[in-house]
């Protein structure tokens, strides 16, 4: 189900480098969230535990290290040496099942546990469809679907990346998707978040930061200072590379209130992951103009539950206003005639050092349906941020 230590999304490795550099003593706990309350089949946890144990066998090969060194110019020699000796520790993952309810937690040093989320979700997804005897569409029909999507995106000149590792139907289907898209002569695929597939198909690995980076800074520095300290720390770690900032962890309103000229010029653009995308375009364009920055020199990366029609609709509102690209996930890797799992694994708690107290980590987003974390802490965060506005 997992093919390599690099069968993971790039932003997990980039964040791991930053954590290893800046926050090596931080401990974290992640929790699996089954948003749709999907019932899991009998003995699912037992089968999942077998897959988790198998993860300890993956190591970075010399060829993979050479690939990262040549391709990912932002990865430091220190980090690559660390990753070369990294192994997954199954003891960091706790899996249990009560009737049809699945529970998964990941706990340990942040710089180690950060790599679990994506492959673990990919395993849960693929294993679920195996154990429920899901019947996907015939391969040739899936290929036609893949090609039709690629043609529409190409005809509309939409630059997009595959972001579908976490909720893919299968590893083999994921690989077939990339192969199908690349078979189209004038495709507009700019890369994939999956580092292993980027290596295999010689396309660009794509990704910067996830919500957990900013969520942690909310614990470290308080909710009002979470965004500015998170982007400043990112700049310290990468010196201007990987310059796409995520806006919605504590709402875009709060993000823009501290996204000043320095960081607006330093960062290449922002990522939209919740809320109304059209209203978001207007706000971001206006914000850059207020800072005397030409919006057409900046980029918005859209990644909020996209399908092809949504991408076309959004793109039409960006033309001649701001650059745009799209991270399309489940709609690419799990549009095979089954219902994809609606699940996430999110940072739930962290402590700044082993001797420090644990604190709840939360995310607001621009969509209340995507709020995650302890309900009391969410209410406290909202009060704190409202007082500061």
From Swiss-Prot:
Coiled coil: none annotated. GO terms for molecular function: nicotinate phosphoribosyltransferase activity. Pathway: Cofactor biosynthesis; NAD(+) biosynthesis; nicotinate D-ribonucleotide from nicotinate: step 1/1. Its EC number is 6.3.4.21. Signal peptide: none annotated. HAMAP family: NAPRTase (MF_00570). Catalyzes the synthesis of beta-nicotinate D-ribonucleotide from nicotinate and 5-phospho-D-ribose 1-phosphate at the expense of ATP. Belongs to the NAPRTase family. This is Nicotinate phosphoribosyltransferase.
């Amino acid at each position: 189900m997992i093919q390599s230590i690099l069968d993971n999304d790039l932003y997990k490795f980039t964040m791991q480098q930053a954590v290893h550099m800046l926050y090596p003593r931080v401990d974290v706990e992640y929790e699996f969230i089954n948003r749709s309350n999907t019932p899991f089949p009998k003995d699912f946890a037992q089968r999942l535990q077998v897959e988790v144990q198998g993860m300890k066998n993956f190591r970075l090969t010399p060829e993979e290290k050479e690939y990262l060194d040549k391709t990912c110019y932002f990865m430091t020699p220190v980090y690559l040496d660390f990753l070369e000796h990294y192994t997954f520790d199954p003891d960091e993952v706790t899996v249990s099942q009560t009737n049809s309810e699945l529970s998964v937690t990941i706990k340990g040093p942040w710089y180690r546990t950060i790599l679990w989320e994506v492959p673990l979700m990919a395993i849960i997804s693929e294993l679920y469809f195996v154990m429920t005897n899901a019947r996907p569409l015939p391969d040739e029909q899936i290929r036609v679907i893949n090609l039709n999507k690629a043609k529409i995106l190409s005809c509309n000149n939409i630059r997009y990346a595959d972001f579908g590792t976490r909720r893919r139907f299968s590893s083999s289907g994921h690989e077939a998707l990339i192969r199908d898209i690349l078979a189209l002569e004038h495709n507009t695929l700019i890369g994939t978040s999956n580092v292993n597939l980027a290596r295999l198909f010689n396309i660009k690995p794509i990704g910067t930061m996830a919500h957990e980076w900013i969520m942690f800074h909310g614990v470290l520095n308080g909710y009002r200072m979470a965004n500015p300290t998170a982007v400043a720390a990112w700049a310290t770690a990468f010196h201007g590379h990987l310059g796409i900032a995520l806006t919605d962890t504590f709402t875009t309103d709060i993000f823009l209130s501290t996204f000043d000229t320095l960081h607006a010029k330093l960062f290449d653009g922002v990522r939209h992951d919740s809320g109304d995308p059209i209203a978001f375009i207007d706000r971001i364009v206006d914000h850059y103009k207020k800072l005397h920055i030409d919006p057409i020199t900046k980029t918005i990366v859209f990644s909020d539950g996209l399908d092809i029609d949504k991408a076309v609709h959004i793109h039409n509102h960006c033309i001649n206003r701001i650059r745009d690209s799209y991270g399309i996930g489940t709609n690419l890797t799990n549009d095979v005639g089954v219902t994809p799992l609606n699940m996430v694994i999110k940072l739930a708690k962290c402590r700044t050092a082993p001797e420090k107290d644990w604190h709840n980590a939360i995310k607001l987003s621009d969509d209340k349906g995507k709020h995650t974390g302890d309900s009391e802490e969410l209410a406290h965060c909202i009060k704190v941020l409202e007082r500061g506005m």
